[in-house]
Amino acid sequence: MQERQDTGSDAAFTGASSNNQLVAAANPLLNAIPQIRHSVSHDDQVALRQRLIDEIRRFEVRCQQAGLPYEVIVGARYCLCTALDEAAALTPWGSSGVWSSNGLLVTFHNETWGGEKFFQLLARLSQNPREHILLLEMINYCLLLGFEGRYRVLDNGRTQLETIKQRLWQMIRGVRGSYPPPLSP
């Protein structure tokens, strides 16, 4: 996060964040995903990790102030930690040091890899999209910003992931109606 790169991700949040308090509260963390993913080096990983921990705590406060249910906040936090950890792990600097042993998912959920559970959560929430639309939209943005989880390493994983993204977008449109799909970086 040394320097901000324009990946178009800010534009991705316009549609949903105006209708979705969860996405609006998560914007700083969602915006950090491409910033981290595209950074070639980071001089102070410990400080970056602490800034993200502090921002996750602010996210939780914003969600509580908005009256969002605890389960939604925890689910969103899990997905955000997983996406941020993956973004860091895929950088030249993130595969060693702070993130290799003490990612955000470990800090907040005492887990080391959420690449499977992220999609299990998506499958569960997809059973009742109207009830879970806020979190489904936030998951959609994590995917649009490049999160791949277990599909990164599976044979034909990217094709499977594209199918998941398409189904998720159709589900969201089914609940929200038509508005232009968000831009993907």
Predicted regions, residues:
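Charge-enriched, short contiguous segments at helix-coil
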Residues: 150-162
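Membrane-proximal low-complexity regions enriched in glycine and acidic/polar residues
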Residues: 74, 79-151
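Non-catalytic, solvent-exposed interaction/assembly segments
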Residues: 2-86
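Amphipathic alpha-helical interaction surfaces
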Residues: 35, 39, 58-69, 82-93, ...
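Juxtamembrane amphipathic/hinge helix adjacent to a transmembrane helix
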Residues: 162-185
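Conserved aromatic-histidine-acidic binding/catalytic patches
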Residues: 17, 44, 68, 106, ...
